[in-house]
Amino acid sequence: MEESHFNSNPYFWPSIPTVSGQIENTMFINKMKDQLLPEKGCGLAPPHYPTLLTVPASVSLPSGISMDTESKSDQLTPHSQASVTQNITVVPVPSTGLMTAGVSCSQRWRREGSQSRGPGLVITSPSGSLVTTASSAQTFPISAPMIVSALPPGSQALQVVPDLSKKVASTLTEEGGGGGGGGGSVAPKPPRGRKKKRMLESGLPEMNDPYVLSPEDDDDHQKDGKTYRCRMCSLTFYSKSEMQIHSKSHTETKPHKCPHCSKTFANSSYLAQHIRIHSGAKPYSCNFCEKSFRQLSHLQQHTRIHSKMHTETIKPHKCPHCSKTFANTSYLAQHLRIHSGAKPYNCSYCQKAFRQLSHLQQHTRIHTGDRPYKCAHPGCEKAFTQLSNLQSHRRQHNKDKPFKCHNCHRAYTDAASLEVHLSTHTVKHAKVYTCTICSRAYTSETYLMKHMRKHNPPDLQQQVQAAAAAAAVAQAQAQAQAQAQAQAQAQAQAQASQASQQQQQQQQQQQQQQQQPPPHFQSPGAAPQGGGGGDSNPNPPPQCSFDLTPYKTAEHHKDICLTVTTSTIQVEHLASS
């Protein structure tokens, strides 16, 4: 036979639960029931055994409170004793999560002006009022919501469970011992901050309502959400630091005001970013889809979507000539006209052709004079045929120059002006467009036209045309001078080459003359120079009597001749002596 799991030793039996412990257990059970039920609004099914609150006989009711026990209930708790207990049914209320108290057998509570036998049981209404006054006889039906709180005898402080509309529990204190019933007074609200666990005079800890939320719970709930709201404009942020930085914008001075609207800003950089909304400037372009943005942060956020998967799925149409992709076939067809050079849209006024219909529509406004884009700046009545021209014009009013040169850090209002400026950094482009009034030179006709507006002549167009013609003539003259210089250099090179050739010929002739023998030494049988005519030399030089056959060079022959001549002179001198 197996041993029973029940420990028969009375030493290990649990102690008899107190009144406060039964209240906490009952409230915990009711809370679990509310959470497990699918519909909290429906009524609770009656339990198999009614929930009983055991009040010991030693605990007496407050002054003026008594129970009508005409018929006592026979249902007791396992640890209760019929001779020393009185039972009160505690009925849970689903709508509030609290409990109503009533007599288990009688139909109502009766208020009597009897003497108080000690503070052991306290009954309050949901609003927090203490039902202990014996001023008049009052009856409370069993359906009335009553809240029960009990303490051991001898304690003077009584805990009262407040209504759910209050977040901070209030404490009622009653001065015990005297006759006529004790009166209760509401204590002031405790200070904010972390609450310490207080102990009652009886030595038991103070009981709080587990269903009432405290201010600390609300703060924790806000921290879990990770959102911070600005008190001035109700904007929400995900970090406290961002909210603090934003809140400074409501308190700091804002001297920079927008000329188009009433907004003001704390510094000039914020104002410059805001002005781009009015001017339409978008200097930051995407390298993938050529979209433009006003701020660098917007461009960085946009480039995140350009992954490999995004390009393959969103832009499946790829150009066969380059690496560009497009979302649909119409965009691809427009792009292919760049490679093929096709321009199907022709102008009916000047027979110009364009690749896109929108370009033709913009061009026809030049002939018709239609200028739908007008400047809204006060005092400015200019109108433009294209939106881009209007946006560039607005930047002149706003003094916004987002297009900057990387070489000299100069800024411009549009990309075309920046491209013209970048050409000045190259050596090929020279300043050929000169003003006829002040003789200033510029690298492009656009800059010259802008400069001519400053002089404000009577006929600006004629002046510009004259300046352009003068620039063309100057350019032609410069080209002619360059050609003349090139021809002169070629002639100089030819003359130098001829002179060098003549010098080489002279050197060769001199070498040949040095190699020939002296004219007065000739080999026997050699004909005299000058031919056999009558112009022969009357005093011919003496001929050499030596045979030159064994001598290969004239130098050797010359040495021999000199030696023979010297020896002959010596012989003649000896003979004469």
UniProtKB/Swiss-Prot annotation:
Region (Disordered): 171-225, 501-550
Gene3D superfamilies assigned: Classic Zinc Finger (3.30.160.60)
One Gene Ontology term, aspect cellular component: nucleus
UniProt keyword terms in alphabetical order: DNA-binding, Metal-binding, Nucleus, Phosphoprotein, Repeat, Transcription, Transcription regulation, Zinc, Zinc-finger
Protein name (database record): Zinc finger protein 384
Domain of life of the organism encoding this protein: Eukaryota
Biased segments, Low complexity type: 501-515
Compositionally biased spans, kind Gly residues: 175-185
Family statement: Belongs to the krueppel C2H2-type zinc-finger protein family.
GO MF annotations, alphabetized: sequence-specific double-stranded DNA binding; zinc ion binding
Modified-residue entries (Phosphoserine), positions: 214
Pfam families given in the database record: zf-C2H2, zf-C2H2_6
Oligomeric and partner information: Interacts with BCAR1.
SUPFAM superfamilies: beta-beta-alpha zinc fingers
Record function comment: Transcription factor that binds the consensus DNA sequence [GC]AAAAA. Seems to bind and regulate the promoters of MMP1, MMP3, MMP7 and COL1A1.
Zinc finger (C2H2-type): 228-250, 256-278, 284-306, 317-339, 345-367, 373-397, 403-425, 433-455
Signal peptide: none
